[in-house]
């Protein structure tokens, strides 16, 4: 395993749990504790994890927002499995909005490059991915947030208020039965709120780590979601609560 791949796996393992010890990471990856400690120091310097006594913990909290780069390396297998299922919702001639985010980016990578949809997004990175070959793509315009690479602000909001979409692929930082869908940033929350409002069908694409978490600003209730696609398997209580809000749940897609 190359050093870059080893470090990516460390971030993934730490982020997918409440934390990992040096010993656990060493056993899992097959490298010495000294190597793991050096990697953790470097990853903390890059803002990808936080070191704790004897190991490392994720950097997330209610008011704290991970960067695009931090999220990009987390649970890639799960995100790709979600994307495989998500593109089954596409139909010829649709106008499809892709929310800015790392899971929606994986969905964009799976979209057929045959020009059968019109893609719209507030993510310049995602627009480049969609624009390969024959697909037509429109950007919202607006101010680019450095942390998440998402376009926000009055120009982006004005675009949203004048447009409508057949389908929305929506991401979230957190999903909680009581709080609904939440995100750390108010400008992004407003954009997501408009996406949901203007879409005929809302497909939430989020890995199971988002469930049971709350962030700073609510942008949608569960009742506004039509379909929830996730990698892991929901427990019976969570499934019942989400489905009782009228949401169709497709879980366990990474099995």
UniProtKB/Swiss-Prot annotation:
Transcriptional repressor of genes encoding both fructose and glucose metabolic enzymes such as phosphofructokinase (PFK) or 2-keto-3-deoxy-D-gluconate kinase (KDGK) during growth on glycerol. Required for the glycerol-mediated repression of pfkB-specific transcripts, but not needed for the high-levels of the pfkB-specific transcript present when cells are grown on fructose. The keyword Transferase does not apply. Keywords: Carbohydrate metabolism, DNA-binding, Fucose metabolism, Glucose metabolism, Repressor, Transcription, Transcription regulation. Disruption phenotype: Leads to pfkB-specific transcript up-regulation. GO terms for molecular function: DNA binding; DNA-binding transcription factor activity. CDD domains: HTH_ARSR. NCBIfam families: TranRegGlpR_Halo. Residues 3-58 form the HTH deoR-type domain. Residues 20-39 bind DNA. The keyword DNA-binding applies. This is HTH-type transcriptional regulator GlpR. InterPro entries: ArsR-like_HTH, Carb_Metab_HTH_regulators, DeoR-like_C, DeoR_HTH, Glycerol_resp_trans_regulator, NagB/RpiA_transferase-like, Tscrpt_reg_HTH_DeoR_CS, WH-like_DNA-bd_sf. Induction: Expression is repressed by glycerol but highly up-regulated in the presence of fructose or glucose, regardless of glycerol supplementation. GO terms for biological process: fucose metabolic process; glucose metabolic process. The gene is glpR.
């Amino acid at each position: 395993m190359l050093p870059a791949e080893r470090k990516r796996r460390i971030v993934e393992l730490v982020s997918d749990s409440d934390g990992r010890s040096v010993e656990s990471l060493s056993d899992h990856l097959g490298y010495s504790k000294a190597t793991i400690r050096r990697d953790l120091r470097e990853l903390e310097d890059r803002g990808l994890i936080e070191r704790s006594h004897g190991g490392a913990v994720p950097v997330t909290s209610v008011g704290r927002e991970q960067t695009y780069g931090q999220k990009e390396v987390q649970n890639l297998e799960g995100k790709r499995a979600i994307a495989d299922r998500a593109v089954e919702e596409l139909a010829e001639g649709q106008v499809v909005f892709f929310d800015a985010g790392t899971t929606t980016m994986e969905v964009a990578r799976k979209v057929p490059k045959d020009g059968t949809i019109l893609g719209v997004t507030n993510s310049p990175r995602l627009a480049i991915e969609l624009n390969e070959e024959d697909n037509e793509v429109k950007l919202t315009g607006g101010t680019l947030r450095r942390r998440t690479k998402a376009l926000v602000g009055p120009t982006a909001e004005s675009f949203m208020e004048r447009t409508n979409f057949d389908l929305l692929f929506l991401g979230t930082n957190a999903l909680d039965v009581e709080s609904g869908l939440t995100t750390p940033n108010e400008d992004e929350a407003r954009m997501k709120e408009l996406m949901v409002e203007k879409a005929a069908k809302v497909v939430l694409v989020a890995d199971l780590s988002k469930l049971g978490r709350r962030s700073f600003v609510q942008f949608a209730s569960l009742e506004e979601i039509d379909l929830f696609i996730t990698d892991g398997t929901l427990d019976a209580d969570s499934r019942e609560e989400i489905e009782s809000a009228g949401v169709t749940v497709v879980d366990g897609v990474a099995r």
